[in-house]
Amino acid sequence: MKFKQDFFTQLPEFYSQVYPQGISNPHWLAWSEDAAKLIDLQQPTDALLQGLSGNAAVEGASYYAQVYSGHQFGGYTPRLGDGRSIILGEALGPQGAWDVALKGGGPTPYSRHGDGRAVMRSAVREFLVSEALHHLGVPTTRALAVIGSDMPVWRESQETAAITVRLARSHIRFGHFEFFCHSERGQADKLTQLLNFTLKQHYPNLSCDLAGYKAWFLQVVQDTAKLIAHWQAIGFAHGVMNTDNMSILGDSFDFGPFAFLDTFQEDFICNHSDPEGRYAFGQQPGIGLWNLQRLAQALTPVIPSDDLIAALNQYQHALVQHYLMLMRVKLGLTERADSTAEQDQQDLELIGRFTVLMEKNQLDYSNTWRRFGQLDPSSAHSSLRDDFIDLNEFDAWYQAYQARLGKVTDIEAWQQARNSVNPKYILRNYLAQEAIIAVEEGNLAPLERLHQVLRQPFAEQVEHEDLAKRPPDWGQGLIMSCSS
């Protein structure tokens, strides 16, 4: 790997230098060829294994943990930081630079009495979801590899330590700006320094002045809205939408007790530590705005409040428009280039009626959408009909849907288009759990199989049909722990 060290050299007060502590008996558990290409790597080697496991130095790496704060479940925590993630620097690739981080690399000054380690199950889950979201077309950080060990660590019980090698376009979070506004008061110069760095690195078309700052914040608002629209359309629940888990670039970031929906449930909670459902699936759009408001508060020393509010007021429109675009494609509806607010509302109601029907009939979210690939939209009798209990209610919806759809001349092409946007394969929690259990037993084949299938989520892959089925009773709607 070839590195540059812009964050390390230009922002010395934004991190602590810390070196990883190696893990015993490191071995590859998973490797992403797709992610490796981003930083010009070929095959996993023993030398690379030793370097990324913390047992040997990586040439050109600087090793540091970033400091930030954040709002966690609504309350402000003044000092967080990378408690178990150590960044090596920005690795150069054919299409730009990517931060390389060792998640589980050992304790840092921000570990808050933790051991700085990640357990194998959480490392595998982060690897799988990073790559799954990418291949579904959702903005996300990436995962290069998972490195296992025989090092014992204690959570609820004894587990083994592992390292996820994460790639990110940037590790700058909403919480970075909050730290230098709230926790380090009177340091507007640091806010400006961080803001200028962010613009130069990731928004080179914007000037480092008030006009550029205003344009940048509006872009952050729009990117965040688009990200959450993706989550709602694909049926993804993040689980821990704290402001320190929000990427300034609008990428899915810092995965913990996430879940893809099995049965559609608007108020689905995937996080065992969130009994009141602050971060439930249906709450994500509102939390996205709330988090942006916290970021806006942190930026008031450098951007006037009126300008911040004006940008925040664009959030709902950006969210709805992107969500409509994604859902219209899923349904096969033509995009209305010059749609009116009334027409948009009609489409939202049509979509909403269908998801309500899904919830009332306890239908599988992804599999129901996939059924549109076998639908003859010109037929008065829908092949979806047998899935519903209240046939009158479905028939009324289907008639409204056909009226909005209009005439379809090439049914086969229409069906293929639906299959290209409605995935057959998603990372169901029970599939991840089965792969993790197999790894614990020394069998990597289920993990490798699942990873390869998730690389082509829209393909039929008939030999892997079992991975597309609804989960068994024990695996339906699994709620995960935050411990990792």
Curated annotation (Swiss-Prot):
Keywords: ATP-binding, Magnesium, Manganese, Metal-binding, Nucleotide-binding, Nucleotidyltransferase, Transferase. InterPro entries: SelO. One of its GO terms (molecular function) is magnesium ion binding. The keyword Cell cycle does not apply. ATP binds at G81, G83, R84, K103, D115, G116, R166, R173, D254. Belongs to the SELO family. This is Protein nucleotidyltransferase YdiU.
